């Protein structure tokens, strides 16, 4: 996809967002329901794509990606109305005779840049949150998970108008073109070096970013632990997804 096509997608989403169509809570809920039904309809395709890209078994695919994503979408559907209501706040002395409220409003046109290690979970969960909050979304899946990217694109094309959600496939050129655009929010999951580049590019427009860049994850084993059970659970957590998990145990702190 070339620069002009990406600019057109972002422009179309911004025009759509300015209609305030996404501000309607019922519209947000309907979008989430469509996402849930599309994921359910393509469960077999998702499992096959994860097997193709990462070698995941169907059980692991459901436990780590399909089932967890559906659970998050259900959670958003159940709570989107409550989250969207104005909240009463205490007033200061100057406004003592007033009623003070805060109202959550959408960011606007958002970008989700997803990784290869959990290509569905780390796309669908932030997508559900963005839709529940009333945003439009451009998704950039990882080029290192092409089968998963193709299924994500199919799911989103079936569930959404491109003015609400669009998937942009490709590699480095598409990443560069996307980061040249002005966004209202960027959600990136990936490496520290690329995260620094995303933050640098976002800073030119003061775009708020959420960067999930992994880290070092301790595992604490205290004196009351059953060592056989603890060892089995630590090994499971470390080698789930062949160790490619940002919160997999990295070191132990043993009492």
Where are these regions (language model features)?
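N-terminal Rossmann-like NAD(P)+-binding subdomain of aldehyde/semialdehyde dehydrogenases
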Residues: 1-101
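A structured beta-alpha segment of the ubiquitous adenosine-cofactor-binding alpha/beta core
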Residues: 99-101, 167-184
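ALDH superfamily catalytic-core signature
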Residues: 160, 193-255
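A glycine-rich helix N-cap at a beta->alpha junction
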Residues: 161-167
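Short beta->alpha connector loops at strand-helix junctions that form conserved
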Residues: 135, 140-142, 169, 189-190, ...
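Conserved small-residue-rich beta-alpha loop and adjacent elements
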Residues: 91-160, 206, 228
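Short gly/ser/thr-rich secondary-structure transition/capping motifs
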Residues: 89-97, 167-170, 233-234
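Residue-level signal for inorganic ion chemistry
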Residues: 28, 73, 134, 165, ...
């Amino acid at each position: 996809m070339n620069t002009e096509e990406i600019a057109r997608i972002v422009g179309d989403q911004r025009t759509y967002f300015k209609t305030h169509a996404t501000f309607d809570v019922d519209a947000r809920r309907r979008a989430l329901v469509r996402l849930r039904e599309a994921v359910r309809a393509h469960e077999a395709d998702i499992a096959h794509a994860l097997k193709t890209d990462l070698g995941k078994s169907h059980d692991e695919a459901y436990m780590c990606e399909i089932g967890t994503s559906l659970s998050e979408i259900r959670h958003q559907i159940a709570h989107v109305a409550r989250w969207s209501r104005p909240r009463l706040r205490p007033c200061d002395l100057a406004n003592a005779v007033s009623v003070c409220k805060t109202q959550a409003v959408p960011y606007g046109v958002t970008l989700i840049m997803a990784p290869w290690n959990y290509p569905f979970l780390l796309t669908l969960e932030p997508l559900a949150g963005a839709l529940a909050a009333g945003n439009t979304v451009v998704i950039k899946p990882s080029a290192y998970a092409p089968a998963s990217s193709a299924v994500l694109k199919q799911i989103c094309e079936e569930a959404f108008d491109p003015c609400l959600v669009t998937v942009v496939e490709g590699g480095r050129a598409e990443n560069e073109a996307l980061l040249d655009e002005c966004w209202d929010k960027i959600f990136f999951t990936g490496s520290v070096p690329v995260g620094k580049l995303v933050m640098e590019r976002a800073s030119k427009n003061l775009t708020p970013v959420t960067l999930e860049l992994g880290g070092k994850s301790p595992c604490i084993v205290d004196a009351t632990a059953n060592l056989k059970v603890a060892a089995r659970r630590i090994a499971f957590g470390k080698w789930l997804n062949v160790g490619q998990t940002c919160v997999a145990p990295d070191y132990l702190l043993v009492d």
